[in-house]
UniProtKB/Swiss-Prot annotation:
Subcellular localization, as worded in the UniProt entry: Cytoplasm
NCBIfam families (alphabetical): tyrS (TIGR00234)
Residue stretches making up the S4 RNA-binding domain: 338-399
Motif mapping: 'KMSKS' region: 227-231
Protein name: Tyrosine--tRNA ligase
Length: 403
């Protein structure tokens, strides 16, 4: 059954920040053919977290509508380093690092994308064939003034911070990727808008129909404030154990839950709207959070793993009388981690480290429902825990890297 274009547009726009241009997309959809959907990933971080999957989820939505995904691994651009949103020059990766990280990407993306509707491509396939003259011709299509329109370049120029010449090539090469792939739509984060529009301009320059651009928001981490990232310690990795994944999802605030559902859930919009109506009529948001956490764990593991994670969570937490609205704490730690006694003092669960050590000796401290007996225990960056002292004191704590 053919889905009306208006309904397709609604599905495509779900959760997106911007769609450029909607009338052009309607014209492409009216051609009634599989569109070529491009999203590029520089293999700088081999392990994906849920923040990375926002783009992949949108690609999956488009696949469900019958379109073809072009999962572009920027092995060539990865050796340049994308400067988007950065105030300093990023060091390039070696070809060996890029190859190793690219393999890890391929092992993970098919947990979301349909393999039969996905083409994994590497931009070195066409970029390695360009000679010096070709690159100079590509660079000649745009001016330095145009490049300085990009926010991060402009700020660095105004503050006299260095901009390497090769960094100007990055948006040009990303744009040329769209030419090489004849992309109909390109997806990217809001911080990539300049580069995505570069693809439209270069396609027009090379006599192609310009791609539509869909920008997706950057997913907030567990703290609900900063972008999800490993360095901030507020992430959920897609290869984490079912129990860790489930527990972290259950730890997010009720407000953040709706944001995660909008960007990460595959449940139909009518179902999500019904959930919102139910909560408005008095249903406990925790019930919805359980359904959402089970969906995500099932996607990256299995239904059986999700059910086991729920059972474990209920046995350790819900029967332990943990309140719904736990205070949120974001604590910093160095490479050695944060000592448990310092954590208890900094969160105010104990008045001093001496009291903290005494409570541990007495068996009155739990992390994620498990009793702590080691007074020298340290929590590492990236950990998210629910801490309990005695029967009535609780806190939710995220450990991030010391700045």
């Amino acid at each position: 059954m053919t889905i009306p274009i208006s309904e397709q547009i609604e599905i495509i726009k779900r959760g997106c920040s911007e769609l450029l241009l909607e009338d052009e997309l309607e014209q492409k959809l009216a051609q009634n053919r599989p569109l070529r959907i491009k999203a590029g990933f520089d293999p700088t971080a081999p392990d994906l977290h849920l923040g990375h999957t926002v783009l992949l989820n949108k690609m999956r939505h488009l696949q469900d509508l019958g379109h073809h995904a072009l999962f572009l691994i920027g092995d060539f651009t990865g050796m340049i380093g994308d400067p988007s949103g950065k105030n300093t020059t990023r060091p390039p990766l070696s070809r060996e690092q890029v190859a190793e990280n690219a393999k890890s990407y391929q092992d993970q993306v098919f947990r979301i994308l349909k393999p039969e509707q996905t083409e994994v491509v590497f931009n070195s396939a066409w970029m390695d064939r360009l000679n010096a003259a070709d690159l100079i011709k590509l660079a000649a299509t745009h001016t330095v003034a145009r490049m300085l329109e990009r926010d991060d370049f402009g700020k660095r120029y105004q503050s006299n911070k260095p901009i390497a010449i090769h960094e100007f090539l990055y948006p040009l090469i990303q744009g040329y990727d769209s030419v090489a792939l004849r992309a109909d739509i390109e997806l990217g984060g809001t911080d990539q808008k300049f580069n995505l529009l570069m693809g439209r301009e270069l396609q027009k320059h090379f006599g192609q129909a310009s791609q539509c651009v869909i920008t997706m928001p950057l997913l907030e981490g567990l703290d609900g404030v900063n972008k999800m990232s490993k360095s901030a310690g507020n992430y959920i990795g897609i290869t984490e154990s079912p129990g860790n994944m489930f527990g972290k999802l259950m730890s997010i605030s009720d407000e953040l839950m709706w944001r995660y559902i909008e960007l990460l859930s595959f449940e139909p919009l009518r179902v999500v709207r019904q959930w919102q109506q139910d909560v408005g009529n008095g249903r406990n948001p925790r019930d919805i959070k359980v359904l959402f956490a089970q969906e995500i764990v099932t996607r990256f593991h299995s239904r059986q793993d999700a059910e086991a994670a729920l059972a474990d969570f209920e046995s350790r937490f819900r029967r332990g009388g943990i309140p719904d609205d736990l205070p949120e704490n974001i604590l910093q730690a160095g490479k050695e981690g944060l000592p448990i006694a310092q954590l208890l003092k900094q969160t105010g669960l104990t008045a001093s480290t001496t009291e903290a050590l005494r409570m541990i000796e007495q068996g009155g401290v739990k992390l994620n429902g498990e009793k702590v007996s080691d007074k020298t225990f340290r929590l590492s960056c990236g950990q998210m825990v629910i801490v309990q002292v005695g029967k009535r004191k609780f806190a939710r704590v995220t450990i991030c890297e010391e700045k």
